[in-house]
Amino acid sequence: MTEQKVDWEPVIGLETHVQLGTNSKIFTSASTSFGDDPNTHIDPIVCGLPGTLPVLNKKVLEFAVKASMALNLKIAKHCKFDRKQYFYPDLPKNYQISQFDEPIAEEGWIEVEVAEKGKETYLKKIGIERLHMEEDAGKLVHAGSDRLSGSKYSLVDYNRAGVALAEIVSKPDLRSGREASEYASEIRRIVRYLGVSDGNMQEGSLRCDVNISVRRGPNAPFGTKVEIKNMNSFSAIQKACEYEIKRQISTYESGGIVHQETRLWDETKQLTKSMRSKEGSSDYRYFPDPDLGPIEVSVELQEKWRSELPELPSSKRHRYAEELGLSVYDARVLTDDYQMARYFEIVVLEGADPKLASNWITGDIAAHINANKKSFENLLLTPKQLAEMLLLISQGKISGKIAKEILPELLEKGGSPKELVEERGLGMISDPKVLGAIVDQLLSDYPNEVESYRGGKNKLQGFFVGQLMKKTSGKADPKLGNQILTKKLKGE
């Protein structure tokens, strides 16, 4: 394939399906529990059997409105549900209840930080066209293949059918695979901070479809749009976009035609494959659902839900950098995980230095959590205990080396760092008389090195510092020890 040329501009929009974290489904009391035996969470309403009537789950409405507010969308005065008609085995009713022309919210935006390779990080405002509520479909399992083509037979699990979704449709404001990936990442951060979804891509709680075309320059008409599905990571979103951009440019430049279609991303082969021609809205024959009346969210209810919104990740990043003096990178890493950010803030409230807390949390503690598949929520080392350890370091009572020695036990069992240090006799030696006596002994042990130092080999200072730390098992106060060494080496 030919490389992307300067005169071609990609145009990308994302449809992000967020599974809302309610205990029951959108129109029925059936459970939303993930990973249970197939077809154990279905009922007559999910299957659309005659005589059943759907009833909107109020928690779904609350989560959808809160997500809309966080995305700066305007909440509609009233909205309605529609039936989207299509035949596919994973849809037990042969129609999906969605929102067509009157969604819950429209016209919003978010800002994302984009770090393109070889470029400076920049902020970009991405428009959001709408957010609408709908029900999820079931899941097909193909025997002998990961798709229908090539499989011996298919099984259908309706446990997911009827689970509440919020579909977030961006405007075609994205111009690269990296921007698309960063936008999707920020959407996930936001819904996790709100507590409306776990955003788990591996479990299908957050799924993205990419709509992509290319055109000759920013003022040219949009090209033919292609939809890409089957991306289960942010890296896959970026790679799929980059591949499809090159494919479309190559097609146009060789005189071919880009067809409006749905394509699948093949993670193994790192390319997109044609799946089917893309349907238009008329193919779905939308009409208002006669079993569900229009919805109106009162101003009072909107204000109540708005007052419950937490501080969002973009605001936290800015505050950490401006008020706590953290680097942009550290602020981003901390706020990427809501539980990590919450843990960090409690540690700082307990009196720990923000930069020191950030280093330990994003370093050793995050590494422990990742290696042991834990989370900050169930960490045995409480924020208060970590703050206690960091204060011991700041006050010069233990060294960073000693802190690293006791950290594994604290992570496994919890407990007071101060008591552990006292119990093991690991406290810092900061008494000038005690350190002075140790330095005197050290200098008498290495007379030749002392003579060389006094002869002008000042680099031997590092050797003596190392020996001092070795002799004290790392417990000597580094600053005070260095001062005493310097004076005694100079014969003062």
From Swiss-Prot:
PROSITE patterns: GATB (PS01234)
One GO process term, biological-process aspect: translation
Coiled-coil regions, chain positions: none
One function term, GO molecular function aspect: glutaminyl-tRNA synthase (glutamine-hydrolyzing) activity
EC numbers, comma separated: 6.3.5.-
Alphabetical UniProt keywords: ATP-binding, Ligase, Nucleotide-binding, Protein biosynthesis
Cited SUPFAM superfamilies: GatB/YqeY motif, Glutamine synthetase/guanido kinase
Keyword Ligase: yes
Catalytic function, reaction form: L-glutamyl-tRNA(Gln) + L-glutamine + ATP + H2O = L-glutaminyl-tRNA(Gln) + L-glutamate + ADP + phosphate + H(+); L-aspartyl-tRNA(Asn) + L-glutamine + ATP + H2O = L-asparaginyl-tRNA(Asn) + L-glutamate + ADP + phosphate + 2 H(+)
Pfam families attached to this UniProt entry: GatB_N (PF02934), GatB_Yqey (PF02637)
Family of this protein: Belongs to the GatB/GatE family. GatB subfamily.
Function: Allows the formation of correctly charged Asn-tRNA(Asn) or Gln-tRNA(Gln) through the transamidation of misacylated Asp-tRNA(Asn) or Glu-tRNA(Gln) in organisms which lack either or both of asparaginyl-tRNA or glutaminyl-tRNA synthetases. The reaction takes place in the presence of glutamine and ATP through an activated phospho-Asp-tRNA(Asn) or phospho-Glu-tRNA(Gln).
Subunit record text: Heterotrimer of A, B and C subunits.
Descriptive protein name: Aspartyl/glutamyl-tRNA(Asn/Gln) amidotransferase subunit B
Organism this protein belongs to: Prochlorococcus marinus (strain SARG / CCMP1375 / SS120)
Phylogenetic classification of the source organism: Bacteria, Bacillati, Cyanobacteriota, Cyanophyceae, Synechococcales
